[in-house]
Curated annotation (Swiss-Prot):
Organism the protein comes from: Geobacillus stearothermophilus
Protein name: Alanine racemase
Inhibition and activation profile: Inhibited by acetate and propionate. Irreversibly inhibited by cycloserine.
SUPFAM superfamilies: Alanine racemase C-terminal domain-like (SSF50621), PLP-binding barrel (SSF51419)
HAMAP family: Ala_racemase (MF_01201)
Catalytic activity: L-alanine = D-alanine
InterPro entries membership: Ala_racemase, Ala_racemase/Decarboxylase_C, Ala_racemase_C, Ala_racemase_N, Ala_racemase_pyridoxalP-BS, PLP-binding_barrel
Gene name per UniProt: alr
Effect of R219K: 4-fold decrease in activity
Cofactors required: pyridoxal 5'-phosphate
Pathway field: Amino-acid biosynthesis; D-alanine biosynthesis; D-alanine from L-alanine: step 1/1
Keyword annotations: Isomerase, Pyridoxal phosphate
Binding residues for substrate: R136, M312
Length: 388
């Protein structure tokens, strides 16, 4: 690859993302919109590349966490409707309106300030967030809800486009709290004189498990990337998800250690016999965290343990034998019959699968595959992007 100069890279299978969205499109009622969630650089997969693929596969809208992410998509040529799920500043409402970006609203005082600051000419579309039990953002009070709706109706350039909530436990096998939140949302809908054009409550877990409780839009996030919302509900999903992200490197140095020789900072690993040790150019600055010591990678189709402490830019693995420099190493993905999934990495880190691709940093170039060929290489360092 001429687009990056270190032998570490991630591969993003856009065909897998396309299939995951298309399969959801088939599962849902025909009149249900799909909002593809591409916040956090599309969970580390690549925002604009995933956005385009999701829209091609049947999504009609996009969601991000904050306004800067939405503006970045606009700058990259994305014209589809975008919703900011998080909080925005009242002073930025004009910029959002100019760029046709919808904002989440959940406070009447915020709307009052935005109303005083904005006089047009573009409409500002709002989605009213209701707190049914997540305890994060959202309105809980009927009177506050009515104040917000009245403020929107009073302003000539404010439009109430949507109403939504977020489930805290839709990814758990037990559905008691999910049912409580759903029932509460139905009750809150009665606080409005009429429903806005878009009503949405279902995240990935709810949209896959309860397609009959999605109103007329779902927010498709983690499952779009081929990851189950939780290990517990993975067997309950209506179709198999296709994991899109893999991570690779190459051996840059191979050496034989004698019994008693040490490896890495702190000299925490000691060779017990003659051992072949390989160095690969990836470390915790790339998101391959120090806690992954004692985990494993795949090399020559076999598992190879990570030995010694993971460094900022490199780590060491115990090889099955004297392999040549340049041999491919897979940290996430498949080699032969062996697979390391994102769930495997998350389990070792004692975290959720969402965190793993999000953690792989901008230093790691992304290679995007579409129709089983390289479509684009994105290197956030230096020369940026190139297309095949």
């Amino acid at each position: 690859m001429n687009d990056f100069h270190r032998d570490t890279w991630a591969e993003v299978d856009l065909d897998a993302i396309y299939d995951n969205v298309e399969n959801l499109r088939r599962l849902l009622p025909d009149d249900t919109h799909i909002m593809a969630v591409v916040k956090a650089n599309a969970y580390g997969h690549g925002d604009v590349q995933v956005a385009r693929t999701a829209l091609e596969a049947g999504a009609s809208r996009l969601a991000v966490a904050f306004l800067d992410e939405a503006l970045a998509l606009r700058e990259k040529g994305i014209e589809a409707p975008i919703l900011v799920l998080g909080a925005s500043r009242p002073a930025d409402a004009a910029l959002a309106a100019q760029q046709r970006i919808a904002l989440t609203v959940f406070r009447s005082d915020w709307l009052e300030e935005a109303s005083a600051l904005y006089s047009g000419p573009f409409p500002i579309h709002f989605h009213l967030k209701m707190d049914t039990g997540m305890g994060r953002l959202g309105v809980k009070d009927e009177e506050e809800t009515k104040r917000i709706v009245a403020l929107i109706e009073r302003h000539p350039h404010f439009v109430l486009e949507g109403l939504y909530t977020h489930f805290a436990t839709a990814d758990e096998v037990n559905t008691d709290y999910f049912s409580y939140q759903y029932t509460r949302f139905l009750h809150m809908l009665e606080w409005l004189p009429s429903r806005p054009p878009l009503v949405h409550c279902a995240n990935s877990a709810a949209s896959l498990r309860f397609p009959d409780r999605t109103f007329n839009m779902v927010r498709f996030g983690i499952a779009m990337y081929g990851l189950a919302p939780s290990p517990g509900i993975k067997p309950l999903l209506p179709y198999p998800l296709k994991e899109a992200f893999s991570l690779h490197s190459r051996l840059v140095h191979v050496k034989k250690l004698q019994p008693g020789e040490k490896v890495s900072y702190g000299a925490t690993y000691t060779a017990q016999t003659e051992e072949w040790i390989g160095t690969i150019p990836i470390g915790y600055a790339d998101g391959w965290l120090r806690r992954l010591q004692h985990f494993h990678v795949l090399v020559d189709g076999q598992k190879a343990p990570i030995v010694g402490r993971i460094c900022m830019d490199q780590c060491m693995i115990r090889l099955p034998g004297p392999l040549p420099v340049g041999t491919k190493v897979t940290l996430i993905g498949r080699q032969g019959d062996e697979v390391i999934s994102i769930d495997d990495v998350a389990r070792h880190l004692e975290t959720i699968n969402y965190e793993v691709p999000c953690t792989i940093s901008y230093r790691v170039p992304r290679i995007f595959f579409r129709h089983k060929r390289i479509m684009e290489v994105r290197n956030a360092i230096g020369r940026g992007e190139s297309s095949a």
